Amino acid sequence: MRFSQTLIPTLKEEPSEAQVISHKLMLRAGLIRQLGAGIYTWLPMGLKVLRKVETIVRQEMDRAGAQEVLMPSIQPAELWEESGRWKMYGKELLRITDRHNRSFCYGPTHEEVISDLVRREIHSYKQLPANFYQIQTKFRDEVRPRFGIMRGREFLMKDAYSFDIDEAALDKSYRLMFEAYNKIFNRLDLKFRPVEADTGAIGGASSHEFHVLAQSGEDVIASCTHCQYAANLEKAFGIAVDLDGGVPEAMVRVATPGQKSIEEVAAFLKMDKARTVKCLTWHDPEADQWYLLLLRGDHTLNEVKACNATAPLAQIPAPEKAVEALGVAVGYLGAVGAEKFNKPVKILADSALRDVTNMVCGANEEGYHLTGVNWQRDLPKPEFVDLRNVEEGDGCPRCGPGSMELSRGIEVGHVFKLGYKYSEAMGVKVLDEDGKEKPLIMGCYGIGVSRIVAAAIEQNHDENGIIWPLAIAPFEVEVVVMNPNESDAMEKAEEITAQLQAGQLEVLLDDRDERAGSKFKDADLLGAPYRVLVGGRAFKEGVCEVKNRRSGVVEKIPVESVVETLLQWLAQEKKA
């Protein structure tokens, strides 16, 4: 492949619209160009990377026994009405009406379509287990598409769906997919972590996310320093550092004028904010049920856990709404005396508060707090549930010696045990061994194929550009001719390129009549694992300069040994 004959529109300046490094580098390296909000055209270099990711995903799905299909992007509304998601999914679902006034959607997922296919084609337990996958363009109408390919509206996804006769069989299918995902990300040569996750809007029982580790990641991952336990922050549980107990003190009403925040109250009373109680109002609008959520003052609320403990649509209400509904004093809210609120409230306390003594909480009176508050004596012990975000240094819930540490990741894969959610709603049944109809139990397994490209860049770059992992590099070697007008150097560069290609390597030959410095910058930007420089003083001395893009090390290799040396190096890297 010749640079001069390929569309690689590199940019010297950082695009002003790009916020994250992957978006900046994908634009600068000429991998993509934006067509509309969250919609991108993949140019030749970007498409080569995308296809390599796709190939690895396809190979491992095939090895795991999944069967490839291709389902329509446009889906009839009737299927989504059957599952109940037509109304539930919200504005992210792009809805379409055809000339006959029939409603459709552009599929963000394909649970309904695959369920319809299976109920039509699979009728007996003898046809199980069944696992179908596709690699296809999806569309989600994100309200604020950003970060380039990372959070676009149109994206390439691998989605798979398994159907089994019972939970034991689903466990096997789930394990096969879990292992296949580990193999995929290992082959992609990315640092990643599978973590336990909340099932979210798709629903279901068990769930794991696969995260590419990167400081720029949107998601926070909590993992144990000693064992394999890891979970998304939405799901993670940690054992809070215990507070020293103590003899219960008398409850005292203390004036705290103007002290409303946890930090202000703790400083004013000269005490550890861990002994203060954060009391939050929480409201379920569907049932008009009010809650008080209690946490240690040094902890933060996990809203996903709070919804799981109360209601899916519950949320923190606006302060003025809480004041109007409950008659409470903002900044001085407390659980003692909650029975006197204007409306009944249910109290839930985070598990970390279970054994805390001599707490401080609001007195439900402007300018006052209560100190020395203790369970049972001053207020009944409420229901204790996990409501908080894990903190760095918490104890591991799975092993004794481990502690939790927090890192950032980019979600690129997700596996779910869906259960009977769709099969029961849509009548996906087979005859079992006894000739009785039985609903199938489902799993679903997604990988963001295009997102992996952006995540790989977020993890593998430096100030000069991309550093591609070998498995997905658009080419393994870039041969740079310092001056294409020097016939000897040009002929040798073409010879080296041809010999490397004969050794089954993909090579980019930079034969442009450009300044050498500009070519070097483009080579670093494009990120090929190795760069071979042909020309200049080194070439006259009978050597080529070979640069390892990741380490930055430059070695002078005799011209006649360049091909053999590179073939050996790359063979060793591929084995590793």
Curated annotation (Swiss-Prot):
Similarity comment = Belongs to the class-II aminoacyl-tRNA synthetase family. ProS type 1 subfamily.
Signal peptide positions on this chain: none
- The name this protein goes by in its record: Proline--tRNA ligase
User: According to its UniProt entry, what is the function of this protein?
Assistant: Catalyzes the attachment of proline to tRNA(Pro) in a two-step reaction: proline is first activated by ATP to form Pro-AMP and then transferred to the acceptor end of tRNA(Pro). As ProRS can inadvertently accommodate and process non-cognate amino acids such as alanine and cysteine, to avoid such errors it has two additional distinct editing activities against alanine. One activity is designated as 'pretransfer' editing and involves the tRNA(Pro)-independent hydrolysis of activated Ala-AMP.
Predominant localisation class? cytoplasm
* GO MF terms held by the record: aminoacyl-tRNA deacylase activity; ATP binding; proline-tRNA ligase activity
Q: Where in the cell is it found?
A: Cytoplasm
Enzyme Commission no: 6.1.1.15
Q: What is known of its domains?
A: Consists of three domains: the N-terminal catalytic domain, the editing domain and the C-terminal anticodon-binding domain.
Q: Which GO terms describe its biological process?
A: prolyl-tRNA aminoacylation
Keyword Glycosyltransferase appears in the UniProt entry: no
Assembly behavior: Homodimer.
Q: What is a single Pfam family found in this protein's UniProt entry?
A: tRNA-synt_2b
Which GO CC terms are listed, alphabetically? cytosol
Record's InterPro entries?
aa-tRNA-synt_IIb, aa-tRNA-synth_II, aa-tRNA-synth_II/BPL/LPL, Anticodon-bd, Anticodon-bd_dom_sf, Pro-tRNA-ligase_IIa, Pro-tRNA-synth_IIa_bac-type, Pro-tRNA-Synthase_IIa_type1
Keywords, in A-Z order: Aminoacyl-tRNA synthetase, ATP-binding, Cytoplasm, Ligase, Nucleotide-binding, Protein biosynthesis
Catalytic activity annotation:
tRNA(Pro) + L-proline + ATP = L-prolyl-tRNA(Pro) + AMP + diphosphate
